[in-house]
Amino acid sequence: MRKLLLSNDDGVHAPGLRALHDALDRHGRLRVVAPDRDKSGASNSLTLTRPLSLTALDNGFYSVDGTPADCVYLGVNGVWDEKPDLVISGINHGGNLGDDVLYSGTVAAAMEGRNLGMAAIAISLCGERYFDTAGRVAATLVGAAESLSLPPRSLLNVNVPDVPWEEIQGVRVTRMGYRGPAAEPMRVRDPRGRERYWIAAAGDNADDGEDTDFAAIEAGFVSITPLQTDLTRHAALDDVRNWLDALSNS
């Protein structure tokens, strides 16, 4: 039976993680390793300045006092004698669209699985209501990953519209869109009168063309975006070389 490692960034007690577990319960041997609290926005950070605690909970899940990437690292290297066959992260409470993936702990947990040699899927619900819909999508994809042999080190970012299953329009393979700059931080004062700051909402869609994840969700489709860890802007390599040549000759 396949070994499936589940994690998230909303925390080990999040409804989305429970929904993912319940949806995949018949698809393999499950192990859940997730942060002990909400770690949204943690991205790919690892805890390097202190030791981590891995705690077994009464429901069979494991909690870690660290980041989503920590959880997958420990889940792969510290919980099982054998490596998992697939890492699934989610179900996130809210979408991870466009350049959200640069900040997302949900995507980072899946990416850590990919970095450790496994195929991985990050799944997010673009809302907080129909987790059962996202769970059915996850179960379908995990079944397909088994029958069609999703290659090792594959990384899929999946976003699901927050609608009943019957209202899903289909599935689109998409590219990442991108957002404009985020809003300015919100300034507040604490009880002692000191100024504090809340990080503001993400920016508006700057690229939501028909082939993007934004457009797929807006039209009611599940969005599946294959991701890679190579952030090199290959089209700019020659431009930068020419710029340096001009600089050295000036």
Curated annotation (Swiss-Prot):
Its main location: cytoplasm. It comes from the Bacteria. Keywords: Cytoplasm, Hydrolase, Metal-binding, Nucleotide-binding. The keyword Metal-binding applies. GO terms for cellular component: cytoplasm. A divalent metal cation binds at D9, D10, S40, N92. Its cofactor is a divalent metal cation. Binds 1 divalent metal cation per subunit. It holds the Pfam family SurE. It catalyses: a ribonucleoside 5'-phosphate + H2O = a ribonucleoside + phosphate. Its EC number is 3.1.3.5. InterPro entries: SurE, SurE-like_Pase/nucleotidase, SurE-like_sf. It is found in: Cytoplasm. One of its GO terms (molecular function) is 3'-nucleotidase activity. SUPFAM superfamilies: SurE-like. HAMAP family: SurE (MF_00060). Belongs to the SurE nucleotidase family. Nucleotidase that shows phosphatase activity on nucleoside 5'-monophosphates. This is 5'-nucleotidase SurE.
